[in-house]
UniProtKB/Swiss-Prot annotation:
The modification N-acetylalanine is found at residue 61. This is Cysteine synthase, chloroplastic/chromoplastic. Belongs to the cysteine synthase/cystathionine beta-synthase family. Pyridoxal 5'-phosphate binds at residues 147, 251-255, 339. Disruption phenotype: No visible phenotype. The gene is OASB. It comes from Arabidopsis thaliana.
Length: 392
């Protein structure tokens, strides 16, 4: 296959997961329920047409295998080509009392179930294109709260890189298991030191490891760049430019910076709202501290974060984030992580403001809930299941 840029395969116009929705100006005048019904009718008709004629199906990367005598199949050549083009869905039941519509960008549907799959691919590919790393020779080193590490690990495994990760011991057990399953080496750091401690340990490993290279997700332009090139355009396309407000958690700052910049260039009046933990609300003027919202609230201002892009910060407590995550599963059928709960809680707050009546809010759900089964998010359910006995 011909070489492509780090995001080329992510930007094909249609994918097998991308809804064949055709926007019509007439839809904008309908009520929310009528608009959804109309969109469903159009989508269903388009899908029927697609089934009748499969020759025009385009996936994220159309397979080219001439040596096998088969070309143009709707089959990706490797797992990395499954990244991106994640769907959006309206929230319907947790938004009672809201005057704005809330649509979630489901990054939980990435191949390794988090938004960090995008930057894992982007940072490795960018370093390769610059001649900084070589498969089978270079040792990749990075600090992670888990999801970036997983995104890096599955790409590193497919390309033949050794990967050493540092992670606070407070992160979920599932993260440890997944990282090891992909063959990554894992070094745990003191929970009290947060991501700062993990970064310091990664820097120590970098100094003593030959042929090593640190990807630096908090200070790597390839991070916001991939969101500017892919996530932002996807949200813009799926909302047909009707998005009024963007809500996203702030971890590395890559998602909110890349997406916010792309959309604001096309719609300057877009309002961008960043979400951080109440217990570590440094962007809102607070102090860093321990919290339970894994993936956001690193305790410092990441260099990737463009402060000029963000219009407002909302602090959400760990307890509210956890409870909202639970309600998303129980009421919406969406099993999401704690940071998704935080983002949803913030989006619901914004959607209840009278000045936002009739507006469309897009909120990013970064990761899948199954990665949090050992955390407080599922503690009561886990204890209940552990006590279950077979019926006689």
């Amino acid at each position: 296959m011909a070489a492509t840029s780090s995001s080329a395969f992510l930007l094909n116009p249609l994918t097998s997961r991308h809804r064949p929705f055709k926007y019509s100006p007439e839809l904008s005048s309908l009520s929310l329920s009528s608009r959804k019904a109309a969109a469903f009718d159009v989508s269903s008709a388009a899908f029927t047409l697609k089934r009748q004629s499969r020759s025009d199906v385009v996936c994220k990367a159309v397979s080219i295998k001439p040596e096998a005598g088969v070309e143009g199949l709707n089959i990706a050549d490797n797992a990395a080509q499954l990244i991106g083009k994640t769907p959006m869905v309206y929230l319907n039941n947790v938004v009672k009392g809201c005057v704005a519509s809330v649509a979630a960008k489901l990054e939980i549907m990435e191949p390794c179930c988090s938004v960090k799959d995008r930057i894992g691919y982007s940072m490795i590919t960018d370093a390769e294109e610059k001649g900084l790393i070589t498969p089978g020779k270079s040792v990749l080193v990075e600090s992670t709260s888990g999801n970036t590490g997983i995104g890096l690990a599955f790409i590193a495994a497919s390309k033949g890189y050794k990967l050493i990760l540092t992670m606070p011991a407070s992160m979920s057990l599932e993260r440890r298991v997944l990282l090891r399953a992909f063959g990554a080496e894992l070094v745990l750091t003191e929970p009290a030191k947060g991501m700062t401690g993990a970064i310091q340990k990664a820097e120590e490993i970098l100094k003593k490891t030959p042929n090593s290279y640190m990807l630096q997700q908090f200070d790597n332009p390839a991070n916001p760049k991939i969101h500017y090139e892919t996530t932002g355009p996807e949200i813009w396309e799926d909302t047909r430019g009707k998005i009024d407000i963007l809500v996203a958690g702030i971890g590395t700052g890559g998602t909110i910076t890349g997406v916010g910049r792309f959309i604001k260039e096309r719609k300057p009046e877009l309002k961008v709202i960043g979400v951080e933990p109440t217990e570590s609300a440094i962007l809102s003027g607070g102090k860093p501290g321990p919290h339970k919202i894994q993936g956001i609230g690193a305790g410092f201002v990441p260099k990737n974060l463009d402060l000029a892009i963000v219009d407002e910060y909302i602090a959400i407590s760990s307890e509210e984030a956890i409870e909202t995550s639970k309600q998303l599963a129980l009421q919406e059928g969406l099993l999401v992580g704690i940071s998704s709960g935080a983002a949803a809680a913030a989006a619901i707050q914004v959607a209840k403001r009278p000045e936002n009546a009739g507006k469309l809010i897009a909120v990013v759900f970064p990761s899948f809930g199954e990665r949090y089964l050992s955390t407080q998010l599922f503690q009561s359910i886990r204890e209940e299941c552990e006590q279950m006995q077979p019926e006689l």
